[in-house]
């Protein structure tokens, strides 16, 4: 494994997983407080 191969996989993974977690936590927060 080269050092150049790691960011090419890690960056899109974080770029997709982090917003998904943020949206999920926000959705659960809104559902819990019923601000809709």
UniProtKB/Swiss-Prot annotation:
Signal peptide: none annotated. One of its GO terms (cellular component) is photosystem I. May help in the organization of the PsaL subunit. The keyword Translocase does not apply. This is Photosystem I reaction center subunit VIII. Disulfide bonds: none annotated. It comes from the Eukaryota. The chain crosses the membrane at residues 10-30. Belongs to the PsaI family. GO terms for biological process: photosynthesis. It is found in: Plastid, Chloroplast thylakoid membrane. It is a single-pass membrane protein. The keyword Manganese does not apply. InterPro entries: PSI_PsaI (IPR001302), PSI_PsaI_sf (IPR036357). Keywords: Chloroplast, Membrane, Photosynthesis, Photosystem I, Plastid, Thylakoid, Transmembrane, Transmembrane helix.
């Amino acid at each position: 494994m080269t050092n150049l191969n790691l960011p090419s996989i890690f960056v899109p993974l974080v770029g997709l997983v982090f917003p998904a977690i943020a949206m999920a936590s926000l959705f659960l927060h809104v559902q819990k407080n019923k601000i809709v």
